[in-house]
Amino acid sequence: MSTTLIDRPAAITRDAIRDLYDDYYGTLDEVRLHDWPEFFMQDCLYRVIPRENFEAGYTLSTMQAESRGMLKDRVTGLTRTQMYAPRYYRRFPTAPRIVGEENGGVRTRHNLLLVQTLIDKPSEIVLSAVCHDLIVVDEGRLRFAERVVVFDSEMLPNSLVYPV
């Protein structure tokens, strides 16, 4: 996570937002899962939801967490209890667009492509999505207050085990 401290909402610049995303996706691609929850506020919303549900206004999600504590629990489950074949993920985000401001924070949107590689198989696309985020200044740095990942297909592979 970036060590640059930010002390005012006006500091939510395009460069600061881009640095946040670079750090976020780098952390995930490097499988530093224990660092992932720190990108979120204590009270946050993290949701991975099919496009059909999102557009209909339904909240039924494939994955959802409503606090940093819930995100930490997910990491614990991934690192200590779940069994799955070894794999690598690479995330390919587009540049984020600022689409609005809300309560001192900034709403952004960007596309995301997620590619999975199993050690003994060719790489495959496992997710095509649009990310709707609310970024705020919290404890002197940028964090996600909301991260809603809307994936295009109606189903995700069972193999999508890591955060997006």
Residue ranges and their predicted role:
Residues 24, 36, 71, 135:
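Hydrophobic pocket/interface hotspot
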